Design a protein with these regions (language model features):
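Gly/Pro/Ser/Thr-rich low-complexity, intrinsically disordered segments predominantly at protein N-termini
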Residues: 1-270
Length: 270
């Protein structure tokens, strides 16, 4: 890390270094295992978030929800791959999400993909979580990077408000679900669906006693499997006298539910 970085005084995003080759950025990211904490743009590396227990448990809670919902297609051609905080690359920028998911059967590309070769397909779902980072910054990253044309289909942005002493746990936690199919505002801006899953509603200060099933983010299968060939989702029947295999796609819930009660529980306990 930069010898002059004073993290206790830092305001995010924090410019760490300039004139850094992208390969060096990737090498350091892997070496220090800090995927998702910094990003690269035109040779400049900026720290955008600090690791915290609440941040990591929020990621883990959402990962668990998706894994449970898609368990019937695990290790099949209909599986959903957990890409974690894999580095993505465009001509000018390199960024990682806090987590992302890509269908096994989503085809590779000739150009415009999310890796240096341009052939790796973009994930269909990404999550971005801000704790030290501001709400405006995390939304900007989602809207100006992940949801650009040909990239992710759905994204979840989350802002966890840092607790104010003497509190030791956050009470205000807000999520926004973006989907490129959602109607935009009259001015063309994104119009994500908002969810309050903390213990206090950020809009009015009211207490929230969250219960299972009360705050659920729904991901449509058509969105999660965007770009997957139709013959993979609904394979043609074999010639007689063979019997058609079980339709695994039909075993999936539609929509895929992400119950934020369980995410809140993981964040605020122990």
């Amino acid at each position: 890390m930069h010898s002059k970085a004073r993290w206790e005084e830092a305001t995010l995003p924090y410019e760490l270094a300039t004139e850094v080759p992208f390969d060096t950025y990737v090498e350091r990211t892997d070496k220090y295992n800090i995927h998702g904490w910094w990003e690269w743009e035109n040779g400049t590396v900026r720290v955008i978030e600090f690791p915290t227990k609440f941040h990591e448990r929020c990621v883990g809670g959402i990962v668990d929800e998706i894994a449970i919902a898609t368990r019937t297609v695990k290790s099949t051609n209909l599986g959903i791959l957990n890409d974690g905080s894999t580095t993505t690359k465009t001509p000018r920028t390199g960024k990682e999400s806090d987590n992302s998911w890509t269908p096994v059967a989503k085809p590779r590309l000739i150009r415009g993909g999310c890796d240096r070769s341009g052939t790796q397909p973009w994930p269909n779902l990404v999550i971005e979580i801000a704790y030290s980072q501001s709400e405006a910054d995390v939304k900007r990253k989602v809207e100006t990077y992940w949801l650009q044309a040909g990239r992710a289909h759905d994204a979840i942005a989350i802002k966890i408000e840092e607790p104010v002493a003497p509190a030791t746990r956050p009470s205000v936690m807000t999520a926004w679900h973006y989907c490129i199919n959602h109607p935009r505002t009259a001015t063309g801006a994104f119009n994500p669906t908002r969810y309050e899953f903390g213990t206090i509603d950020s809009r009015n200060g009211n207490q929230i006693n969250l219960q299972p099933g009360q705050c659920v983010i729904n991901i449509q299968l058509a969105c999660l499997y965007h770009g997957v060939p139709a013959n993979v989702l609904n394979p043609p029947p074999p010639p007689p006298p063979q019997l058609p295999p079980p339709n695994l796609f039909a075993t999936l819930p539609n929509p895929i539910p992400i119950d934020m009660f369980h995410v809140q529980f993981a964040m605020l306990n122990n």
